């Protein structure tokens, strides 16, 4: 059974080569973070990368944040989850998500369907696969990438919890109210140890550029009270400050604690580099370690 601690790390692993990946996973383990989360976007395939990270660590939980359900059918997903979980001694946590139409239709050539119905059917397919093949029936936890209330509710009903990304402590409180007290609420939070406002916001704007055009995120940000003016032209200061916890170590820790106070069971920090480079800030990881 996976024991997920309070602090983990998230990183966009597509930016790292072999040596950098090994360095990242081993430093996370040395600093006693509970888990390392990674996405499936442009380069590395989810289970291949998960296997590599597990092979270069001993105790760290390796978590997909998230595996794209359009990349494989439910049986293949269950097989991948089972394989990495069994061969790692239970250190693999599968996060699932519907991804985004840009990454599904333009990149993969699939039709992007209604997210909630598609995810519900996919989870049912994984259950059927486990029932059909006894080797796949061992219980293994799943968390759902969830932004809106309906997907969050589905995660609370059908999985071990949810993994919100690009959210605020207010969203965390809402998600906790939906899923109940006993489910995992694994929140991603970008952090930046830069105290000068203009520099911090420049780096934050760079970090958010990929996400700002995506409808799933924009819809959720509007539910949180942001306007089109906040989200256009690279993001307003108010929006950037809400997405990236920047400033001193004390200020950043206060934001992380705000998520815990709102009901998060686990916060995975994404340590943006103070010079905007596409590599983790290991000084931040050290300063913010559990």
Residue ranges of model-derived segments:
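Active-site-adjacent structural elements that line small-molecule/cofactor binding pockets in enzymes
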Residues: 1-290
């Amino acid at each position: 059974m996976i024991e997920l601690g309070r602090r983990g790390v998230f990183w966009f692993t597509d930016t790292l080569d072999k040596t950098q990946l090994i360095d990242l996973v081993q430093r996370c383990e040395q600093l006693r973070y509970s888990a390392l989360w990674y996405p499936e976007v442009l380069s590395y395939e989810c289970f291949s990368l998960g296997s590599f990270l597990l092979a270069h660590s001993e105790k760290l939980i390796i978590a997909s944040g998230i595996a794209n359900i359009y990349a494989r059918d439910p049986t293949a997903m269950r097989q991948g989850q089972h394989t990495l979980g069994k061969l790692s001694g239970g250190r693999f946590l599968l996060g699932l998500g519907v991804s985004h139409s840009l990454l599904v239709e333009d990149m993969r050539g699939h039709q992007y369907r209604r997210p909630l119905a598609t995810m519900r059917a996919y989870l049912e397919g994984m259950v059927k696969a486990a029932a059909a093949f006894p080797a796949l029936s061992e219980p293994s936890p799943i968390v759902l990438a969830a932004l809106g209330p309906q997907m969050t509710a589905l995660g609370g009903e059908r999985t071990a919890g949810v993994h919100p990304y690009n959210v605020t402590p207010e969203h965390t409180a809402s998600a906790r109210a939906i899923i109940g007290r006993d489910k995992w609420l694994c929140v991603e939070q970008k952090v930046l140890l830069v105290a000068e406002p203009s520099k911090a916001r420049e780096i934050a704007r760079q970090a958010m550029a990929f996400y700002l055009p995506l409808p799933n995120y924009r819809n959720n940000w509007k539910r949180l009270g942001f306007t089109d003016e906040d989200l256009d032209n690279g993001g307003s200061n108010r929006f950037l400050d809400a997405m990236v916890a920047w400033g001193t170590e004390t200020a950043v820790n206060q934001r992380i604690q705000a998520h815990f106070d709102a009901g998060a069971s686990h916060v995975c920090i994404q340590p943006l580099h103070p010079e905007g480079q596409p590599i983790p800030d290991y000084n931040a990881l050290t300063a913010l370690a559990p």
